[in-house]
Amino acid sequence: MAKKSMIAREVKRAETAKKFAAKRAELKAIIASASSSEEQIWEAQTKLQQLPRDASPSRQRNRCRVTGRPHGVYRKFGLCRHKLREAAMRGDVPGLVKASW
């Protein structure tokens, strides 16, 4: 099980990214726009750099909803491979069966 502080940090990062998503999108649009002047692009880049680091969605890490484990997490289920296997063996995941060939 991951430390509670690590899980809380990830939750905080998600909230920060959500809070600044519109502002980041607006600044990135100015930077990517061909009609923007060099001065506007420079200003937008400066403002983008001044936003909090955790406002970037790439700083987020997928974690298991049960254990908080950062590796081996299946996006579709939100569970790490260990807990997904346990849930599948109990029959908690409809349509998921153990492979057999």
UniProtKB/Swiss-Prot annotation:
User: What family does this belong to?
Assistant: Belongs to the universal ribosomal protein uS14 family.
* PANTHER family registered for this protein in UniProt: 30S RIBOSOMAL PROTEIN S14, SMALL RIBOSOMAL SUBUNIT PROTEIN US14M
Which HAMAP family would you find in this protein's record?
Ribosomal_uS14_1
Q: Which Gene3D superfamilies match?
A: 1.10.287.1480
Corresponding gene?
A: rpsN
Keywords of this protein's UniProt record, alphabetized? Ribonucleoprotein, Ribosomal protein, RNA-binding, rRNA-binding
Write one Gene Ontology MF term.
rRNA binding
One protein family per Pfam: Ribosomal_S14
Can you supply a Gene Ontology BP term from the record? Answer: translation
Q: What does this protein do?
A: Binds 16S rRNA, required for the assembly of 30S particles and may also be responsible for determining the conformation of the 16S rRNA at the A site.
Q: What is this protein called?
A: Small ribosomal subunit protein uS14
**Which InterPro entries is this protein grouped with?**
Ribosomal_uS14 (IPR001209), Ribosomal_uS14_bac/plastid (IPR023036), Ribosomal_uS14_CS (IPR018271)
Summarize the subunit comment.
Part of the 30S ribosomal subunit. Contacts proteins S3 and S10.
| One GO CC term on file | cytoplasm
Hydrolase: is it a keyword of this entry?
no
Organism of this sequence: Cellvibrio japonicus (strain Ueda107)
Task: Note the PROSITE patterns from the entry.
Answer: RIBOSOMAL_S14
Q: Is rRNA-binding one of the keywords UniProt gives this record?
A: yes
